[in-house]
Amino acid sequence: MYELDKKDKDILAELQKNCRQSTRTLGRKLGMPATTVYQRITRMRNRGLIKGFSAILDPEKIGLPTVAMVLVKRYVRKDGKMKSEHIGQALAKLPEVQEAYLVTGEYDALIKVRGKSEKEIGKWVVDTLWNMPEVERTLTLFCFYESKESHILQLK
């Protein structure tokens, strides 16, 4: 793990708010030369702390207002040869899946899916997930209200 100092944390906090800021603007805000900001950003990118820079889209405005969390139980062959990682890898490859996690408990994975409607997501679950050899069963939870969605990580 890379140890972040206060300057790195300040830079990352600002980039999470608005990654389109120039190094000059960031430097002015943070009281650092633009070259220092640039070097630190480059170092953090090279070390994998910054995975990339992207636009955050409004799902409703692009026609994907419906969110579902789907719990997935993996199918275990009688010889026990289906590992949890396999289901995670298989789910992560599906373009409709925004997030995929291996979890503890009765189910083995949790995925987040967005779609135009509950009907569309339901059809996708039946047509796609239920036809995967790795999947034994699913439990779909439709989200009726989004209290918070954030891509900002709190740096302490």
Label the model's feature ranges:
Residues 1-156:
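A compositional/biophysical signature of low hydrophobicity enriched in polar/charged and small residues
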